[in-house]
Amino acid sequence: MSTLLSEVESIDTLPYVKDTTPTGSDSSSFNKLLAPSIEDVDANPEELRTLRGQGRYFGITDYDSNGAIMEAEPKCNNCSQRGHLKRNCPHVICTYCGFMDDHYSQHCPKAIICTNCNANGHYKSQCPHKWKKVFCTLCNSKRHSRERCPSIWRSYLLKTKDANQGDFDFQTVFCYNCGNAGHFGDDCAERRSSRVPNTDGSAFCGDNLATKFKQHYFNQLKDYKREASQRQHFDNEHEFNLLDYEYNDDAYDLPGSRTYRDKMKWKGKVQSTRNKNSSNNRYESSNNRKKKSPFSAQNYKVTKNKRVQTHPLDFPRSSQNNRTNDYSSQFSYNRDDFPKGPKNKRGRSSSNKSQRNGRY
């Protein structure tokens, strides 16, 4: 009966004992490791029942300050360490090579393969070797070789057997970059959202279409790119961009600061200078109005109903041209009455030739 209750288990942390039951053959070839009984594991059955559940197979025997059994800490599914969850994991693990805290998965050297030299760690645009011409005989592409053709492991059925083989609706094709219909993601005219360069191409390209569909697809693609360029040009002209305007920190100077006082002081000087200039101009204009001009309206008979269109610099030649008869007797001018110009290098005042001749 004791042999039926004994269980044969593999070596574990429990203190296994060897079975010494005699057999008919050589006992050395039938050595078995028997699991200990319940009495050997724990003499307290209540504690054994408590350990079942979370520590059913591997009992947790750590105790806290109150003497209760401590539960196991949560285990992270990212780094397989206890003490935190996956959302709070501080470690970065590459999904390609498995390195921890070294690089991200998109920067793994094993995942980046150059199509020019077939080496790992860099793209075709950063290849240090001389450029060589590549051609794929499967999809007739010039951006990758036959061994790296995406059509090998990316095969899509665009039509069923019952569908018409001569027609193809390009509105069922959607772009993975901009989300619009009518073109593939590799042929999108918008800015690429992914930072991974698309130098090698992918299966989402018009080059992977059948020969009878390529011409019609690229004709529509040309019209789409033309409309996209026009729309982009219109958006650039009518778009309000905050970066086009410089940051003005004058509006954010707090009263009481040094910059604020300096600017207010400078503004006060400028304002006082402007007020002084304006007062001088008003004084000069008032003096000029007080002086009686020979060409003032007092010397003429100006009618309100009839307007005579004359040039302001034209001098009246006769008494019929709104001129009084006694004008010549009241006013007479000679050369000295006219204002003199600025002095020249010899100290003489430069006068106009017309003034020297007495004409005005």
UniProtKB/Swiss-Prot annotation:
Residues 317-333 have a biased composition (Polar residues). Disulfide bonds: none annotated. SUPFAM superfamilies: Retrovirus zinc finger-like domains (SSF57756). Signal peptide: none annotated. Residues 274-286, 349-360 have a biased composition (Low complexity). It is found in: Cytoplasm; Nucleus. Keywords: Cytoplasm, Metal-binding, Nucleus, Phosphoprotein, Repeat, Zinc, Zinc-finger. One of its GO terms (biological process) is nuclear polyadenylation-dependent CUT catabolic process. GO terms for cellular component: cytoplasm; nucleolus; TRAMP complex. It holds the Pfam family AIR2-like_ZnK4. PROSITE patterns: ZF_CCHC (PS50158). Present with 1550 molecules/cell in log phase SD medium. Component of the TRAMP (TRF4) and TRAMP5 complexes which have a poly(A) RNA polymerase activity and are involved in a post-transcriptional quality control mechanism limiting inappropriate expression of genetic information. Polyadenylation is required for the degradative activity of the exosome on several of its nuclear RNA substrates like cryptic transcripts generated by RNA polymerase II and III, or hypomethylated pre-tRNAi-Met. Both complexes polyadenylate RNA processing and degradation intermediates of snRNAs, snoRNAs and mRNAs that accumulate in strains lacking a functional exosome. This is Protein AIR1. It comes from Saccharomyces cerevisiae (strain ATCC 204508 / S288c) (Baker's yeast). The gene is AIR1.
